Swiss-Prot record:
<dbReference type="InterPro" id="IPR007860">
    <property type="entry name" value="DNA_mmatch_repair_MutS_con_dom"/>
</dbReference>
<keyword id="KW-0547">Nucleotide-binding</keyword>
<dbReference type="GO" id="GO:0140664">
    <property type="term" value="F:ATP-dependent DNA damage sensor activity"/>
</dbReference>
<dbReference type="InterPro" id="IPR007861">
    <property type="entry name" value="DNA_mismatch_repair_MutS_clamp"/>
</dbReference>
<dbReference type="GO" id="GO:0005829">
    <property type="term" value="C:cytosol"/>
</dbReference>
<dbReference type="GO" id="GO:0006298">
    <property type="term" value="P:mismatch repair"/>
</dbReference>
<dbReference type="Pfam" id="PF01624">
    <property type="entry name" value="MutS_I"/>
</dbReference>
<dbReference type="GO" id="GO:0005524">
    <property type="term" value="F:ATP binding"/>
</dbReference>
<dbReference type="InterPro" id="IPR007696">
    <property type="entry name" value="DNA_mismatch_repair_MutS_core"/>
</dbReference>
<keyword id="KW-0238">DNA-binding</keyword>
<dbReference type="Pfam" id="PF00488">
    <property type="entry name" value="MutS_V"/>
</dbReference>
<dbReference type="Pfam" id="PF05190">
    <property type="entry name" value="MutS_IV"/>
</dbReference>
<feature type="binding site">
    <location>
        <begin position="613"/>
        <end position="620"/>
    </location>
    <ligand>
        <name>ATP</name>
    </ligand>
</feature>
<comment type="function">
    <text>This protein is involved in the repair of mismatches in DNA. It is possible that it carries out the mismatch recognition step. This protein has a weak ATPase activity.</text>
</comment>
<dbReference type="InterPro" id="IPR036678">
    <property type="entry name" value="MutS_con_dom_sf"/>
</dbReference>
<dbReference type="InterPro" id="IPR027417">
    <property type="entry name" value="P-loop_NTPase"/>
</dbReference>
<keyword id="KW-0227">DNA damage</keyword>
Length: 858
């Protein structure tokens, strides 16, 4: 360290406190990174990696960015999961002896972003804090850009569902704990010292934040794990934000039992937030329903989808509001137009509180407040009864509008310092400074013209840079005409730069005026923000009301476009849907192309539907549309059906598709069984179970046995008796209806004509005893030889009396053993699930069977 420069020592002292972050070190007009940080920045930001001498014989890697381009580069690093410590100059050059003082003013992490261009407009940016025990967990979350702060304590089995619902950008954990994230989630994991999660430390942090003596008023006094998570979260935010976190005024405490529960598999299988194919908004339920016009409405819709209601009165309030907008098309259209002019008032309110809002954003806020007044005139003066509940917070804020109108210019720049933010006439002293700076600039322009005429040098020009200040530049060709009073300041390749006493005098005048102007404008702007901060709660209340109106009117718009109907709720444990449709599949097919289907499920007489039929015929679509209709109804939306009479559903479970969990070392079948076990252990009589192909991951007889046992268990357990849709390729299960009274058989109608099969996609009563797997294989494009041979093998398998000691030889001389002595191959063929094989897998299987037959000399 002896040969290290003072600047490097200062940097190292700061860097040692932020070893896991990239330090952006302010040096004049640049943020510089050093050493390994510089290598990372150069690679990830695609900027030049250079070096700087920072001691005798010591060259340090260096990469920098202009200070005004910070947000752009910051977003690229944050999106890749990095943390960035912003180290600013906190004193001015010359104010203190030696180096300019520097300190980290903020640690930016994926879960603590507040810059608008770094955030998804219609999605919260949650920071999640977890404290885990063997069977329980405390969970706390916050979005400092919207002031949301909440916590809960729940069973460890429900944790993954909450993580999937919140989709946090960052998760904090004690250093001695670990977490396996859902496969679709890309969250940064940050570890904290376990000290911050200790019960007494965390409780004290919450009490200090809310300035209270106990937490009873917040409803979490008896949630010790939730308190640990919430207290640690506040400590982390305080460390990263270097502020008091005043925007987190309320703590929302909830339990998972307050809402319909859906695990992460259900959210994924039903494609609630993202499509399974492209992992995008398009093709998801959110993509269908999101006709919202505001950022606040988009975020609220996500919350609705993640937390369907269980209280019928709350559902009916939403449905009544949707009724109004459904019936009043002019009001709906007018509101949509107005909402389209509303900025993100929720995040703006918090940026005012944090004093980070830009002058130009205040004009956007002013325009939004004017639109709020117009919406209030339309709905608030005489509130329609069906909207009254959601209009409570909608109130014009004329005083706030007046402050902005009187203080901020009509078209301010994004930054302060040029005297163009504060309106003329607001502060006399500032007006004088602006005039002085303006006069000086005019003088310089006039001086340039005058000196050109006086010297006869037409190419003479005045310029400015931060190193030399103002200067007169003269090309080499005209140096012979330079007056003697010009003082040489800098030599360039093709020109010389000069100053004069007169120019230096005005330089001091201008720079002093600019410095004083920046100080004064910054101070006045802060005063304005302090005044506007007094309307924080009222602004948030307006944002909340507008978000609700936005979502509910969007539900009505979707209902009108797609011919949805209002669902009806009743106390009986049954659901009865007439001509139900799958909202996403219907959109993909186009209007009128989807085949609608009925469904009736009841705990009294039709608790379980066994659904049989070929793949590709629509079994999964039918199962999913039922669950989606139930979910849509309980968020207060109309539903895709002709009629829908429903009961409240406490949980939706889905067991669909095959997947491995490689991180846990679990096979496809083990994953299937674990998920099925979870469903059977936690479902209630008010749950809806969607089970597709239980038992497919093992041998035929094992799978059939498990599938049958699952159906019998759901039917016979008094504490379960959940409404169940059970799709299967095991045709033997249709026999269950003969001795289980609440089991009914349904199948997918198929039309056959001269060997051609047409799937009608219509659900009809009764079971089927025939598979159409080979037909599906034909549709998939398997070679004609394979299809022909498959039909031959199927015929032999279905007619054992006609078997010969050896099967006849086909054109390719492929022989399949069918005698008693070759029972192993025979059993393997019987267990083939042809309808589940891809074309390539089917062909590979045929070659495998051929090889085994040849090895046996058959």
């Amino acid at each position: 360290m002896e040969n290290t420069t003072p600047l490097r020592k200062q940097y190292l002292d700061i860097k040692k406190n932020y070893p896991e972050a990239i330090v952006f070190f302010r040096l004049g007009d640049f943020y510089e990174t050093f050493e390994e940080d510089a290598r990372i920045a150069a690679r990830e930001l695609e900027i030049v990696l250079t070096s700087r001498e920072m001691g005798k014989g010591l060259k340090v890697p260096l990469a920098g960015i202009p200070y005004h381009a910070l947000d752009n580069y910051l977003s690229r690093l944050i999106n890749k999961g990095y943390k960035v410590a912003i180290c600013e100059q906190v004193t001015k050059p010359g104010e203190t002896k030696g180096l300019v003082q520097r300190q980290v003013t903020r640690l930016v992490t994926p879960g603590t972003v507040v810059e608008p261009n770094l955030l998804q407009t219609k999605q919260n940016n949650f920071l999640l804090s977890l404290y885990l025990t063997e069977d329980s967990c405390g969970l706390a979350f916050a979005d400092i850009s919207t002031s949301e702060f909440g916590c809960t304590q729940t069973n460890i089995s429900e944790l993954e569902a909450e993580i999937s619902r919140l989709s946090p950008a960052e998760i904090i954990l004690p250093k001695n704990q670990s977490l396996n994230l859902p496969i679709h989630l890309k969250a940064t994991i940050s570890k904290l010292d376990g000290y911050y999660f200790e019960a007494d430390i965390a409780r004290e942090r919450l009490l200090r934040h809310f300035e209270c003596q106990n937490l009873s008023a917040y409803g979490c006094e008896n949630m010790p794990l939730a308190i640990s998570a919430a207290g640690a979260l506040l400590n982390y935010l305080e460390e990263t934000q270097k502020s008091s976190l005043k925007q987190l005024e309320r703590l929302s405490v909830y339990t998972t039992a307050d809402y319909m529960q859906m695990d992460s598999h259900t959210l994924s299988n039903l494609e609630i937030f993202r499509s399974s194919g492209g992992n995008s908004l398009k093709g998801s339920l959110l993509g269908i329903l999101d006709q919202t016009k505001t950022a606040m409405g988009g975020r609220l819709l996500r919350k609705f989808l993640g937390q369907p209601l269980l209280k019928q009165s709350d559902i009916e309030k939403r449905l009544s509001a949707v009724d109004y907008f459904f019936e009043e098309s002019l009001a709906r259209t007018s509101l949509a137009k107005s909402l389209g002019q509303i900025a993100d008032m929720e995040r703006m309110a918090n940026r005012i509180r944090q004093k980070t809002i830009l002058p130009r954003e205040l004009i956007s806020l002013k325009n939004s407040l004017e639109t709020v007044s117009a919406i209030h005139r339309q709905f608030g003066l005489m509130p329609p009864p069906r909207l009254a509940y959601f209009l409570n917070g909608l109130k014009p804020l004329p005083e706030m509008l007046d402050i902005i109108n009187k203080t901020i210019t009509d078209d301010p720049p994004s930054t302060l310092g040029d005297g163009k933010v504060i309106r003329a006439g607001f502060d006399p002293e500032m007006d004088k400074l602006c005039s002085l700076a303006g006069d000086a600039r005019t003088f310089l322009s006039q001086m340039e013209t005058r000196e050109r005429e006086r010297t006869g040098i037409k190419s003479l020009k005045l310029g400015y840079n931060r190193v030399f200040g103002y200067y007169i530049e003269i090309s080499n060709a005209n140096l012979g005409d330079v007056p003697p009073e010009f003082i040489r300041k800098q030599t360039l390749v093709n020109a010389e730069r000069f100053i004069t006493p007169e120019l230096k005098e005005y330089e001091n005048l201008i720079l002093n005026a600019k410095e004083r102007l920046l100080e004064m404008e910054t101070g006045l702007y802060e005063q304005v923000l302090n005044q506007l901060g007094g309307f924080y709660s009222a602004l948030l209340a307006n944002a909340t009301a507008l978000a609700a109106l936005d979502v509910l009117s969007a539900f009505a718009e979707v209902a009108v476009r797609n011919s949805y109907v209002r669902p009806v709720f009743h106390p009986e444990n049954r659901l009865d849907i007439r001509k139900g449709r799958h909202p996403m599949v219907e959109q993909g097919l186009g209007y009128g192309s989807f085949v609608a289907n009925d469904i009736s499920l009841s705990a009294e007489d039709c608790q379980i539907i066994i659904l049989t039929g070929p793949n590709m015929a629509g079994k999964s679509t039918y199962l999913k549309q039922t669950a989606l209709i139930v979910l849509m109804a309980q968020i207060g939306s109309y539903v895709p059906a002709e009629t829908a009479e429903l009961c409240l559903t406490d949980r939706i479970f889905t067991r669909i598709g095959a997947r491995e969990d490689l991180s846990a070392g679990q096979s496809t079948f083990m994953v299937e069984m674990v998920e099925t076990a979870s469903i059977l252990n936690t479902a209630t009589s008010r749950s809806l179970l969607i089970l597709d192909e239980i038992g497919r991951g093992t041998s035929t007889y094992d799978g059939l046995a498990i599938a049958q046992a699952v159906v019998e268990y759901i039917h016979s357990q008094p504490s379960l008796t959940a409404k169940t849709l059970f799709a299967t390729h095991y045709h033997e299960l249709v026999e269950l209806a003969s001795y289980l009274p609440r089991v009914k058989n349904y199948n997918i109608a198929v039309s056959e004509d001269r060997g051609e099969v047409v799937f009608l996609h219509k659900i009809v009563p009764g079971g089927v005893d025939k598979s159409y797997g080979i037909h599906v294989a034909k549709l998939a494009g398997l070679p004609k030889w394979v299809i022909k041979r498959a039909y031959e093998v199927l015929t032999e398998l279905e007619n054992p009396a006609k078997k010969q000691p050896k099967s006849r030889t086909c054109q390719s001389q492929l022989q399949l053993p069918m005698t008693g002595q070759t029972s192993v191959l025979e059993e393997e063929i019987k267990e083939l699930e042809i309808e589940s094989l891809t074309p390539l897998a089917a062909l590979n299987k045929l070659y495998e069977l051929k090889k085994k037959a040849e090895e046996q000399g058959l």
